[in-house]
Amino acid sequence: MKISLFSAGMLTASLLFSVPTPAHATPDYASLIEQAYQKFKLNHDGKVADYIPALATYSPDNFAITLATVDGKIYQVGDVKKAFPMESLSKVFTLALAMEQRGPQVVLDKLGANATGLPFNSGLAVVLTKGAPENPLVNAGAMSTVSLIEAENKTARWNKILDNLNAWADATLTVNKPVFQSEMATNQHNLALAMLMNSYNSFYGDPRETVEIYTRQCSVDITVEQLAKMGAVLANGGKSPFNGRQLLNESYVPQVLAEMAIAGLYNGSGKWLYRVGLPAKSGVGGGMVAVVPGRYAIAVYSPPLDDAGNSVRAQQTIEYVADATQANLFMAH
Protein backbone atom coordinates (compact mmCIF):
# COMPACT_ATOMS: atom_id res chain seq x y z
CA MET A 1 0.00 0.00 0.00
CA LYS A 2 1.23 3.46 -0.88
CA ILE A 3 0.29 6.51 1.17
CA SER A 4 1.37 10.06 0.42
CA LEU A 5 0.42 12.83 2.81
CA PHE A 6 0.02 16.55 2.24
CA SER A 7 0.06 16.44 -1.59
CA ALA A 8 0.29 19.96 -3.23
CA GLY A 9 -36.80 15.27 -11.23
CA MET A 10 -34.16 17.59 -9.52
CA LEU A 11 -32.29 16.77 -6.36
CA THR A 12 -31.85 19.79 -4.06
CA ALA A 13 -28.44 21.18 -4.83
CA SER A 14 -27.97 22.70 -1.39
CA LEU A 15 -28.35 19.28 0.20
CA LEU A 16 -25.58 17.95 -2.00
CA PHE A 17 -23.12 20.60 -0.94
CA SER A 18 -23.97 22.06 2.44
CA VAL A 19 -23.32 19.04 4.59
CA PRO A 20 -21.82 19.49 8.04
CA THR A 21 -18.63 17.69 8.87
CA PRO A 22 -19.34 14.83 11.27
CA ALA A 23 -18.28 15.38 14.84
CA HIS A 24 -16.56 12.02 15.11
CA ALA A 25 -12.82 11.66 14.70
CA THR A 26 -11.27 11.60 11.24
CA PRO A 27 -11.46 8.04 9.90
CA ASP A 28 -8.34 5.99 9.30
CA TYR A 29 -8.63 6.33 5.53
CA ALA A 30 -5.44 4.37 4.86
CA SER A 31 -6.69 1.28 6.67
CA LEU A 32 -10.16 1.67 5.27
CA ILE A 33 -9.19 1.66 1.60
CA GLU A 34 -6.80 -1.23 2.26
CA GLN A 35 -9.70 -3.20 3.73
CA ALA A 36 -11.84 -2.37 0.70
CA TYR A 37 -9.05 -3.39 -1.67
CA GLN A 38 -8.60 -6.76 0.01
CA LYS A 39 -12.35 -7.32 0.24
CA PHE A 40 -13.12 -6.76 -3.44
CA LYS A 41 -9.92 -7.50 -5.38
CA LEU A 42 -10.93 -11.09 -6.15
CA ASN A 43 -14.39 -10.16 -7.38
CA HIS A 44 -14.49 -10.78 -11.12
CA ASP A 45 -18.11 -9.84 -11.75
CA GLY A 46 -18.80 -7.70 -14.79
CA LYS A 47 -17.31 -7.45 -18.25
CA VAL A 48 -14.67 -5.16 -19.75
CA ALA A 49 -16.17 -2.87 -22.40
CA ASP A 50 -15.55 -4.19 -25.89
CA TYR A 51 -17.83 -2.11 -28.11
CA ILE A 52 -14.80 0.18 -28.43
CA PRO A 53 -12.12 -2.34 -29.49
CA ALA A 54 -9.25 -0.55 -27.74
CA LEU A 55 -11.00 -0.78 -24.37
CA ALA A 56 -11.17 -4.56 -24.63
CA THR A 57 -7.38 -4.73 -24.28
CA TYR A 58 -7.39 -3.60 -20.63
CA SER A 59 -6.94 -6.28 -17.98
CA PRO A 60 -9.99 -7.09 -15.84
CA ASP A 61 -7.59 -7.53 -12.92
CA ASN A 62 -6.62 -3.85 -12.83
CA PHE A 63 -7.81 -2.39 -9.53
CA ALA A 64 -6.81 0.82 -7.78
CA ILE A 65 -8.25 3.13 -5.13
CA THR A 66 -7.33 6.72 -4.25
CA LEU A 67 -8.97 8.90 -1.63
CA ALA A 68 -8.17 12.63 -1.67
CA THR A 69 -9.20 14.87 1.22
CA VAL A 70 -10.09 18.55 1.11
CA ASP A 71 -6.94 19.37 3.08
CA GLY A 72 -4.72 17.86 0.40
CA LYS A 73 -3.97 14.38 1.74
CA ILE A 74 -3.80 11.38 -0.57
CA TYR A 75 -4.36 7.74 0.39
CA GLN A 76 -4.07 5.02 -2.22
CA VAL A 77 -3.65 1.34 -2.89
CA GLY A 78 -3.45 -0.98 -5.88
CA ASP A 79 -2.53 -0.31 -9.51
CA VAL A 80 -2.38 3.44 -8.99
CA LYS A 81 0.16 4.09 -11.76
CA LYS A 82 -1.93 2.48 -14.49
CA ALA A 83 -3.61 5.02 -16.74
CA PHE A 84 -7.00 4.53 -18.34
CA PRO A 85 -9.18 6.63 -20.67
CA MET A 86 -11.55 9.03 -18.95
CA GLU A 87 -14.49 8.29 -21.24
CA SER A 88 -17.66 9.65 -19.61
CA LEU A 89 -15.79 10.87 -16.53
CA SER A 90 -14.66 13.78 -18.69
CA LYS A 91 -18.27 14.97 -19.02
CA VAL A 92 -18.35 16.34 -15.47
CA PHE A 93 -15.38 18.62 -15.95
CA THR A 94 -16.42 19.97 -19.33
CA LEU A 95 -19.82 20.61 -17.75
CA ALA A 96 -18.00 22.56 -15.03
CA LEU A 97 -16.23 24.60 -17.71
CA ALA A 98 -19.53 25.37 -19.42
CA MET A 99 -21.00 26.29 -16.04
CA GLU A 100 -18.08 28.62 -15.32
CA GLN A 101 -18.43 30.28 -18.74
CA ARG A 102 -22.20 30.48 -18.99
CA GLY A 103 -23.64 30.15 -15.50
CA PRO A 104 -26.08 27.60 -14.07
CA GLN A 105 -29.26 29.01 -15.61
CA VAL A 106 -27.94 28.73 -19.17
CA VAL A 107 -26.75 25.20 -18.41
CA LEU A 108 -30.17 24.28 -17.07
CA ASP A 109 -31.98 25.83 -20.04
CA LYS A 110 -29.72 24.43 -22.76
CA LEU A 111 -28.50 21.13 -21.26
CA GLY A 112 -31.16 20.14 -18.75
CA ALA A 113 -31.15 18.30 -15.42
CA ASN A 114 -33.51 15.35 -15.75
CA ALA A 115 -32.79 11.64 -15.76
CA THR A 116 -33.70 9.88 -19.01
CA GLY A 117 -34.27 6.44 -17.49
CA LEU A 118 -32.62 5.04 -20.62
CA PRO A 119 -29.06 3.96 -21.54
CA PHE A 120 -26.40 6.67 -21.82
CA ASN A 121 -26.25 6.46 -25.62
CA SER A 122 -29.99 6.35 -26.23
CA GLY A 123 -31.40 8.03 -29.31
CA LEU A 124 -34.90 7.19 -28.15
CA ALA A 125 -34.48 9.59 -25.23
CA VAL A 126 -33.85 12.39 -27.72
CA VAL A 127 -36.83 11.47 -29.88
CA LEU A 128 -39.25 11.11 -26.97
CA THR A 129 -38.43 14.60 -25.73
CA LYS A 130 -38.22 16.08 -29.24
CA GLY A 131 -34.69 17.20 -28.48
CA ALA A 132 -35.57 18.96 -25.24
CA PRO A 133 -32.47 19.10 -23.02
CA GLU A 134 -32.32 16.19 -20.60
CA ASN A 135 -28.93 16.27 -18.88
CA PRO A 136 -25.27 16.84 -19.77
CA LEU A 137 -24.02 13.45 -18.58
CA VAL A 138 -25.62 11.23 -21.21
CA ASN A 139 -23.88 11.19 -24.59
CA ALA A 140 -26.30 13.48 -26.42
CA GLY A 141 -26.19 16.06 -23.64
CA ALA A 142 -22.43 15.77 -23.21
CA MET A 143 -21.86 16.51 -26.89
CA SER A 144 -24.20 19.48 -26.60
CA THR A 145 -22.05 20.62 -23.66
CA VAL A 146 -18.92 20.51 -25.82
CA SER A 147 -20.69 22.54 -28.50
CA LEU A 148 -21.64 25.12 -25.85
CA ILE A 149 -18.04 25.86 -24.80
CA GLU A 150 -17.13 29.41 -25.77
CA ALA A 151 -14.20 29.45 -28.20
CA GLU A 152 -13.19 31.08 -31.48
CA ASN A 153 -12.81 27.84 -33.40
CA LYS A 154 -12.45 24.07 -33.14
CA THR A 155 -8.79 24.17 -32.06
CA ALA A 156 -9.41 26.81 -29.42
CA ARG A 157 -12.37 24.85 -28.07
CA TRP A 158 -10.30 21.69 -27.68
CA ASN A 159 -7.44 23.61 -26.05
CA LYS A 160 -9.83 25.13 -23.50
CA ILE A 161 -11.27 21.71 -22.67
CA LEU A 162 -7.84 20.09 -22.27
CA ASP A 163 -6.44 23.00 -20.26
CA ASN A 164 -9.42 22.71 -17.95
CA LEU A 165 -8.89 18.97 -17.46
CA ASN A 166 -5.20 19.60 -16.72
CA ALA A 167 -6.03 22.20 -14.08
CA TRP A 168 -8.52 19.95 -12.31
CA ALA A 169 -6.15 16.96 -12.38
CA ASP A 170 -3.15 19.07 -11.34
CA ALA A 171 -1.27 17.32 -14.13
CA THR A 172 -0.48 17.40 -17.84
CA LEU A 173 -2.88 14.94 -19.43
CA THR A 174 -2.59 13.46 -22.91
CA VAL A 175 -4.88 11.81 -25.42
CA ASN A 176 -4.51 8.04 -25.77
CA LYS A 177 -4.13 7.90 -29.55
CA PRO A 178 -5.03 4.20 -30.03
CA VAL A 179 -8.20 4.71 -27.99
CA PHE A 180 -9.04 7.91 -29.88
CA GLN A 181 -8.55 6.22 -33.25
CA SER A 182 -10.58 3.21 -32.14
CA GLU A 183 -13.42 5.43 -30.95
CA MET A 184 -13.37 7.58 -34.09
CA ALA A 185 -13.71 4.42 -36.16
CA THR A 186 -16.76 3.28 -34.17
CA ASN A 187 -18.52 6.53 -33.25
CA GLN A 188 -21.27 6.46 -35.88
CA HIS A 189 -23.90 6.25 -33.14
CA ASN A 190 -22.62 9.40 -31.44
CA LEU A 191 -22.53 11.21 -34.76
CA ALA A 192 -26.13 10.18 -35.36
CA LEU A 193 -27.07 11.49 -31.91
CA ALA A 194 -25.38 14.80 -32.64
CA MET A 195 -27.20 15.12 -35.96
CA LEU A 196 -30.48 14.26 -34.25
CA MET A 197 -29.94 16.86 -31.52
CA ASN A 198 -29.01 19.40 -34.20
CA SER A 199 -32.26 18.71 -36.04
CA TYR A 200 -34.13 19.73 -32.88
CA ASN A 201 -32.00 22.89 -32.46
CA SER A 202 -30.52 21.48 -29.25
CA PHE A 203 -26.95 21.60 -30.54
CA TYR A 204 -24.78 24.70 -30.46
CA GLY A 205 -21.99 24.02 -32.97
CA ASP A 206 -21.01 21.95 -35.97
CA PRO A 207 -21.99 18.32 -35.22
CA ARG A 208 -18.99 16.66 -36.88
CA GLU A 209 -16.44 18.97 -35.30
CA THR A 210 -18.13 18.60 -31.93
CA VAL A 211 -18.18 14.80 -32.09
CA GLU A 212 -14.46 14.77 -32.86
CA ILE A 213 -13.68 17.03 -29.89
CA TYR A 214 -15.96 15.00 -27.65
CA THR A 215 -14.28 11.76 -28.75
CA ARG A 216 -10.86 13.28 -28.09
CA GLN A 217 -12.00 14.40 -24.65
CA CYS A 218 -13.18 10.89 -23.79
CA SER A 219 -9.82 9.46 -24.93
CA VAL A 220 -7.73 11.46 -22.46
CA ASP A 221 -5.73 9.16 -20.19
CA ILE A 222 -5.83 9.60 -16.44
CA THR A 223 -4.70 7.80 -13.29
CA VAL A 224 -6.88 7.10 -10.31
CA GLU A 225 -4.90 9.62 -8.25
CA GLN A 226 -5.50 12.35 -10.81
CA LEU A 227 -9.19 11.48 -10.88
CA ALA A 228 -9.43 11.69 -7.09
CA LYS A 229 -7.76 15.10 -7.18
CA MET A 230 -10.38 16.24 -9.69
CA GLY A 231 -13.14 15.04 -7.42
CA ALA A 232 -11.53 16.79 -4.47
CA VAL A 233 -12.00 20.12 -6.25
CA LEU A 234 -15.75 19.58 -6.08
CA ALA A 235 -15.51 18.42 -2.46
CA ASN A 236 -13.61 21.61 -1.64
CA GLY A 237 -16.03 24.16 -3.05
CA GLY A 238 -14.47 24.38 -6.51
CA LYS A 239 -10.93 25.08 -5.27
CA SER A 240 -8.15 22.57 -5.83
CA PRO A 241 -6.56 21.43 -2.56
CA PHE A 242 -3.45 20.63 -4.61
CA ASN A 243 -2.70 23.72 -6.71
CA GLY A 244 -4.81 26.27 -4.83
CA ARG A 245 -6.71 27.43 -7.92
CA GLN A 246 -10.41 28.30 -7.78
CA LEU A 247 -11.48 26.27 -10.82
CA LEU A 248 -15.23 26.60 -10.43
CA ASN A 249 -17.29 29.31 -8.80
CA GLU A 250 -18.16 27.94 -5.37
CA SER A 251 -21.83 28.79 -5.85
CA TYR A 252 -21.95 26.59 -8.98
CA VAL A 253 -20.57 23.46 -7.33
CA PRO A 254 -23.96 22.28 -5.99
CA GLN A 255 -25.40 22.30 -9.50
CA VAL A 256 -22.58 20.15 -10.87
CA LEU A 257 -23.02 17.73 -7.98
CA ALA A 258 -26.76 17.67 -8.60
CA GLU A 259 -26.19 16.66 -12.23
CA MET A 260 -23.90 13.86 -11.01
CA ALA A 261 -26.55 12.65 -8.59
CA ILE A 262 -29.21 12.71 -11.29
CA ALA A 263 -27.34 10.89 -14.05
CA GLY A 264 -23.76 10.12 -13.03
CA LEU A 265 -24.24 6.35 -13.24
CA TYR A 266 -26.49 6.41 -16.30
CA ASN A 267 -29.68 4.39 -15.81
CA GLY A 268 -28.17 2.98 -12.60
CA SER A 269 -28.10 6.43 -10.98
CA GLY A 270 -31.33 6.08 -9.01
CA LYS A 271 -30.38 2.81 -7.35
CA TRP A 272 -26.92 4.18 -6.58
CA LEU A 273 -28.34 7.27 -4.89
CA TYR A 274 -30.85 5.13 -2.99
CA ARG A 275 -28.10 2.84 -1.65
CA VAL A 276 -25.15 5.16 -1.18
CA GLY A 277 -26.44 8.73 -1.18
CA LEU A 278 -23.46 10.35 -2.93
CA PRO A 279 -23.02 12.20 -6.23
CA ALA A 280 -20.76 10.13 -8.44
CA LYS A 281 -19.66 9.68 -12.03
CA SER A 282 -18.49 6.60 -13.89
CA GLY A 283 -16.88 5.90 -17.24
CA VAL A 284 -16.82 2.80 -19.43
CA GLY A 285 -13.02 2.78 -19.16
CA GLY A 286 -13.52 1.48 -15.62
CA GLY A 287 -13.04 4.66 -13.63
CA MET A 288 -15.46 6.10 -11.10
CA VAL A 289 -15.34 9.05 -8.70
CA ALA A 290 -17.65 10.02 -5.84
CA VAL A 291 -17.71 13.27 -3.89
CA VAL A 292 -18.37 13.87 -0.20
CA PRO A 293 -18.73 17.68 0.07
CA GLY A 294 -16.48 19.23 2.66
CA ARG A 295 -14.61 15.98 3.31
CA TYR A 296 -13.15 13.93 0.47
CA ALA A 297 -13.42 12.43 -2.99
CA ILE A 298 -12.77 8.78 -3.72
CA ALA A 299 -11.78 7.40 -7.12
CA VAL A 300 -11.59 3.76 -8.15
CA TYR A 301 -10.31 2.08 -11.29
CA SER A 302 -11.52 -1.40 -12.25
CA PRO A 303 -12.49 -2.17 -15.88
CA PRO A 304 -15.23 -4.85 -15.52
CA LEU A 305 -18.64 -3.16 -15.89
CA ASP A 306 -22.22 -3.98 -15.04
CA ASP A 307 -25.03 -3.88 -17.60
CA ALA A 308 -25.45 -0.12 -17.17
CA GLY A 309 -21.77 0.54 -17.94
CA ASN A 310 -20.55 1.16 -14.38
CA SER A 311 -17.52 -0.48 -12.78
CA VAL A 312 -18.64 -3.27 -10.47
CA ARG A 313 -15.72 -3.13 -8.04
CA ALA A 314 -15.73 0.66 -8.03
CA GLN A 315 -19.34 0.72 -6.88
CA GLN A 316 -18.66 -1.88 -4.20
CA THR A 317 -15.55 -0.08 -2.96
CA ILE A 318 -17.11 3.36 -2.79
CA GLU A 319 -20.22 2.05 -1.07
CA TYR A 320 -18.03 0.27 1.51
CA VAL A 321 -15.99 3.40 2.25
CA ALA A 322 -19.04 5.66 2.26
CA ASP A 323 -20.82 3.43 4.75
CA ALA A 324 -17.77 3.24 7.00
CA THR A 325 -17.35 7.03 7.01
CA GLN A 326 -21.07 7.82 7.35
CA ALA A 327 -20.90 9.80 4.12
CA ASN A 328 -24.48 9.33 2.89
CA LEU A 329 -25.76 12.87 2.34
CA PHE A 330 -29.30 11.92 3.32
CA MET A 331 -28.29 10.80 6.82
CA ALA A 332 -28.45 13.06 9.85
CA HIS A 333 -24.90 13.70 11.03
Give the label of every model feature segment.
Residues 28-35, 43-44, 98-217, 233:
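Active-site-adjacent helix/loop patches that line small-molecule binding or acyl-intermediate pockets
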Residues 24-65:
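Beta-lactamase-like hydrolase cores
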Residues 7-18:
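Bacterial N-terminal signal peptides
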Residues 52-56, 68-82:
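Short, conserved catalytic-motif segment at the N-terminal edge
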Residues 72, 84-108, 230, 298:
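Active-site SXXK
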Residues 235-333:
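Structured C-terminal helix/loop/strand segments within mature extracytoplasmic catalytic/sensor domains
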Residues 1-5:
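Positively charged n-region of N-terminal signal peptides that target proteins for export
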Residues 60-65, 192-194, 285-288:
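Short glycine-rich loop/turn motifs
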